[in-house]
Every structure is written in C-alpha cells, then in structure tokens.
Amino acid sequence: MGEGKNHQSFSFKNADDEIDLSLSKFSLFKLKMAKSKIIKVFGQNDPVDPNNCYINMRSIKITTSSVLPESDPKYLIWEMSYKTDEEDHTLGQLAWKASYNGTFIVTTTYAMMVTGGELYTPYTAVIRSSDGNEIKGVKVKVTLSWDPANDRPSKARMGGFIQDMYCKTITNGKTQISPMVGWYIGQDERRYCKVLNKSALEFSSEGIYPLMELVSGADSVINPLINKLISGMLNDEEKRRVSLYTSTVGAGTSLTQSEKLLLKKLVESKTGSGLVQFLMRACKELGTDVYLEA
C-alpha cells in the first residue's frame, strides 16, 4: 500500500510479484483511514483543522491488467460499503470483464466527516470474482483521491453518491473489446444501474428486451443488457417461444399463468453468466426500477 498527499493506493498481487490476483487469498481489504493516516496525508499549508473537517472524495481509480483472453467469460466485482454508528451501508458495486486491460475512474461527490480526529464513515471494499472462484492472471490497483475541506460540498451526502464514471482503455496495439461494466448505487431512496458500454444501445434493438419485463412485473423495468445476455444463450426453439410471448404481450394480450411460469423457468435456466447474475441480484435486492445508460 502506498501513500501520498490526499490519495491512497492499494495493489493486489501474489507474494512473488507476478501478475496474478488469487482472489481466494486477496479478496478482502479495508479502506480504513485512521486518525494518524488522515493527518499524515494533509499538506502543511492546507487551511483546515485535520481534527474537525470533511474529507471530500474526488475519485476512485481502478487499474487492471490481465493475461486472460478476451473470450474469457469471467467478471470481477468491486463492492464498496461504509459504516456509521447506527448501521452498515452498501455504497455500490462495479463489475468488469476479468480479461480487461484498462482503467475505470469513478468521480464522486461524497463526503466523510472527521470529528475529534476520528473518521465518521470508514469504508470497506472487496474485489471478488463473479462466480466466487479464484482467478489467476490478473492484477488490480485501486487509488482513492480526496480533498480535505472545512465545508462539505453542497451536492455531497455523507456516504454519498457517484457523480460520474468513465473507462480508459490501455492502447497496446491489440483490438480491445470494451468491457461490460455494471454499477448500481443508492442515492436517497433512488437506485440506479448504469451499463457503460457503447454498444449497449444496440441491445434494446434485439426484440428480446421485453423478456425480463414480463417476468419481473409491470412495476419494474429490468436492464436490457440482461436480456441481451440471456437471449444470446437461447436456441432457435427458445427464441421462437420468446418471440411469440413478446408478440402476444405487444398486441395487448396477457400471458396465461402457465406461459409466465414457462418463461420464468426459461430465464432462470439461462442465467449462468456472472454479469447476468450480478445484475439480476442487483435488481432483486433493490426492488425498484433499473435504468440503462450508455
């Protein structure tokens, strides 16, 4: 772990310094910024009282390098949470292809409070694989950046929300497939799931996207990305059946209970993908609308 003014970096690799992240051994790390560390990273001329101030997070940068082929189906998931005196909070999740080489930068507008020299909201983060198994051939570095301040930004929440996120791809002379990246986070009582993939807009043109809406009910809109991933696993007969169901509903006719059950079983049988499971679980846990952005 390296330290410098107003930022901290966390690297993950095995003991002999190879490009290798054994998630079964290195899956958990804590972003605990204790009293001494907070004071240590302040500059001499910072016009703040390090014992009573705000730490305003600027960004979370995740840089990952991988020797896995682009065809590898596995995903990595970053989960971040924080704890107050009253309760634990899940801040959000981020998923990316384990074969991805590049950088994700999450720019933020959230605050942590220092009172009496103690951090009010210590953060905990986990990096794990989508299926829970060990992944070899990956190295991940996380860098947190923040500014100390006497006043909290007007838009910031304690524990906060993500303002923006974007990806950078390392140019290495190879054709780089953009990673599919999912992120969901709570802001007050609203929940979001963003998919940052330029081709995501194409997913809704597949004609299969109402599939999950039929299963999830009229009060919930599920991310079309899930449907694209599921529809890609369907055989011709299954696609014919889904197309028939979609046409039926599109014409204003409701599905019978047995048709809904068949459709539900079909979806459940096709959700082996790590990202599908991740997004479906996010939707289920949030119990509310999930939006697509590209």
From Swiss-Prot:
Keyword annotations of the record: Host-virus interaction, RNA-binding, Transport, Viral movement protein
Biological processes, Gene Ontology terms: transport of virus in host, cell to cell
Listed GO MF terms: RNA binding
Top-level taxon in the UniProt lineage: Viruses
Function: Transports viral genome to neighboring plant cells directly through plasmosdesmata, without any budding. The movement protein allows efficient cell to cell propagation, by bypassing the host cell wall barrier. Displays an RNA-binding activity.
Subunit structure: Interacts with nucleoprotein.
Protein name according to UniProt: Movement protein
